[in-house]
Amino acid sequence: MAGMKTASGDYIDSSWELRVFVGEEDPEAESVTLRVTGESHIGGVLLKIVEQINRKQDWSDHAIWWEQKRQWLLQTHWTLDKYGILADARLFFGPQHRPVILRLPNRRALRLRASFSQPLFQAVAAICRLLSIRHPEELSLLRAPEKKEKKKKEKEPEEELYDLSKVVLAGGVAPALFRGMPAHFSDSAQTEACYHMLSRPQPPPDPLLLQRLPRPSSLSDKTQLHSRWLDSSRCLMQQGIKAGDALWLRFKYYSFFDLDPKTDPVRLTQLYEQARWDLLLEEIDCTEEEMMVFAALQYHINKLSQSGEVGEPAGTDPGLDDLDVALSNLEVKLEGSAPTDVLDSLTTIPELKDHLRIFRIPRRPRKLTLKGYRQHWVVFKETTLSYYKSQDEAPGDPIQQLNLKGCEVVPDVNVSGQKFCIKLLVPSPEGMSEIYLRCQDEQQYARWMAGCRLASKGRTMADSSYTSEVQAILAFLSLQRTGSGGPGNHPHGPDASAEGLNPYGLVAPRFQRKFKAKQLTPRILEAHQNVAQLSLAEAQLRFIQAWQSLPDFGISYVMVRFKGSRKDEILGIANNRLIRIDLAVGDVVKTWRFSNMRQWNVNWDIRQVAIEFDEHINVAFSCVSASCRIVHEYIGGYIFLSTRERARGEELDEDLFLQLTGGHEAF
């Protein structure tokens, strides 16, 4: 037994004194001194600490933090010897959950208690459960950017700080609903206001404030954001986060699973807000026409949110809508089950044949050319695109045959100018071949664009998603078409008028510099006619879908240096591929699909990522702007997200995620 003494007062056993500070990491905190042995288990040490403090309170959330090893002692049955703790260990007895300031995707600030002892993946899952956000695996936390000291100190406007630090949820139990919201939000007027902030879109920002916010001016600037992601396999305490620190909550992985407006009001709204701010802060590029569509959708969403019309548009019966949807689904199933249709789909391979105008840019042009598009007869079958001089020559050898698997497909569209082009960056031994296809109209463009997108993923037009892809492209084009509403088309929602419309709060600053407000307002109102009948949830979904249609959507940028190269380049990470980008001009140099990846490894000693693809293709690079852990986690995270199944619901294989994203980096 620890602490046995002789008559003279000397200790005759192997016990020794262990000092433990009470509270968070503060050298001046009160401390207790315990008499322990190497065989003392952590649970017994915790009990002795509480007995010596002799203060009645709930200690259930407290645990011991070992400062030198940056480790929580959570295995209460382990002994001090098993942990390797000696008398010189600096130990702190403090709470595992501590307050942090969370900056949400909608830019609002929220105080809550987060776990400082669990891996970040679990801590984010608990935060999302508190905020009523499904599929927490899509989100993560970033460090807040360091504030630059200004020569002239400006008085920052006071912002409202919502507080959920006193809300505690029972573990493992899904929050019950009360009055249309999770029950823990209905406890007080403050928590109810917090839920409304989470689930309802925020008004447009002040245009002057928007112009002052930092924006990326180059690809290298865009890499800075992704250097701040926290490690999902380590706890907040291990990563130097302290109580009261500010963190950002963002959607990290651009692979959104089972997005349902009925069950996901908070998730849908926060995703819309992240997309909106991506556009306003120019973190993703879009054309002038596309910006007008996004501005019109924001204007419509803001009007509906302010008027309280959050449900279906007036004049509709939800019951009838549900019945119509059910009948429509039944009709589709009955039509799709016809034996002749099934037979045709099995015996015929879908293909596209049409006249298209083609312009091919050589990899290294010897001289400048003024030659433009030339009309060809183009045949698109499976994942192969072939073009001929004329239709009569089609049975023979083509001028060129391209396998689009693994290529980059970029839209180049101007609806008002009737320009419908598809830019293809096709991998070749010399690099990426650049080819443009020019279509005659929207219908032709939608069919060929959908086929190219599927082929780039290794799928054919026989895939069940081809028709929905065509429809999604046509829907996005229809939003950009002006004047389609007509004078007699009166929206069911709030009246569309210039009253209360400040266009500078709806468009990115580069468009503010290019156009005057009186030029933007009629264009936004004209685009609004195409979306005026959408409900709030439909408008948010349409905004997100349009955001997903942009060429640069879902690409996270990291500055790297490839093995054997003397210059820095950009590595783009998307949900299905890696993209090598020239830092100087922004051109895509090479693309590698995750589906062709055999394995990847990280050498933590030399900070290098090595990836092996099919056909004995090996790629290695070191990271410049961020830790190689971030690239490793992105790759593993996207592979994990691709394993999700609808049948499993929200059940997560946490061990698999940590296996795919965790590293063996020495802390």
UniProtKB/Swiss-Prot annotation:
Matching entries from SMART domains are given as: B41, PH
GO terms, molecular function: integrin binding; lipid binding
Q: Which residues carry this modification: Phosphotyrosine?
A: Y11, Y504
Residues that bear Phosphoserine: S8
Domain FERM, which positions? 229-558
Question: GO BP, one example?
Answer: platelet aggregation
Q: Where is the PH domain?
A: 354-457
Report the locations given in the UniProt record: Cell projection, Podosome
The entry's keywords: Cell adhesion, Cell junction, Cell projection, Disease variant, Phosphoprotein
Domain notes per entry: The FERM domain is not correctly detected by PROSITE or Pfam techniques because it contains the insertion of a PH domain.
Record note on quaternary structure: Interacts with ITGB1, ITGB2 and ITGB3 (via cytoplasmic tails).
What family does this belong to? Belongs to the kindlin family.
Could you identify this protein by its name? Answer: Fermitin family homolog 3
- The primary gene name is FERMT3
